[in-house]
Amino acid sequence: MEEVEATLMKYMTFNSSCSYAGIANMLERHGLDTSDRSIAIGMKLPYLFFRCNGIYLSGPMLQEAKWFNLYLNPIGYELSEKMMPADEAAAYLKAQETAMLGIRTGNTGKHAVVYTGTRADRLVFLNNKWESEEAPDEIQLTVDELKQKLDPTVVVATLQQVSPKSVSFTDKLQESIAGLAQSFTSLQQELLCALRQEPEQCILLNENISMDRLQTSAQSYAVL
């Protein structure tokens, strides 16, 4: 699709919020004025904590559609994600009005950018960045240049307008509580190992052990 000029660039206002600023930029192209911070607050980001494949995720590291839709669904939008080989991404993007994906940027890992259209033989992306950052607001890439900046398999997110629907935070908050409990157990285990100063004798704690027992155990080892 041909490039559609955005009326206002939405910048990052907190660390690692490029995908959140990206959602704000996509909504801007639909005529909605919001910000990365408003999105984070609207989806109750400070209270979300998730454990996936043994890794604890929170804050702006929660970047999947299921998290963003906590904010988007009530205002009548939904984010969808499509996985595809890198060499199919350019053609897919050209069929969209706007889309978001992660590209490699030097040694800083992946960075979320928003596709806005084409200019001559280049795909044009909004560079979700800090306003004070010395980097261009736009990134223009040929098809080959884009492919070089993508992982072999890429996830492209698109935004669709839907009927507004309410969302329940109950399940997500319960998941957060469970994740925090698991994190606490892991932390206590590391604490006990450190207090013993004998890693080979590290006690493997049961995930269901009570907080009182953990605290008592830690206090006991503290006097050894």
Language-model-detected regions and their locations in the chain:
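A generic N-terminal leader/anchor concept
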Residues: M1-T34, A194-V223
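Alpha-helix capping and helix-coil boundary motifs
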Residues: S35, M84-P85, S168-K172
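Cytosol-facing boundaries of transmembrane alpha helices in integral membrane proteins
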Residues: G31-M43
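Conserved active-site-adjacent core of cysteine acyl-enzyme catalytic domains
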Residues: E2-F14, Y20, A24-R29, K44-Q160
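Noncatalytic regulatory segments and standalone regulatory/sensor domains
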Residues: T118-L224
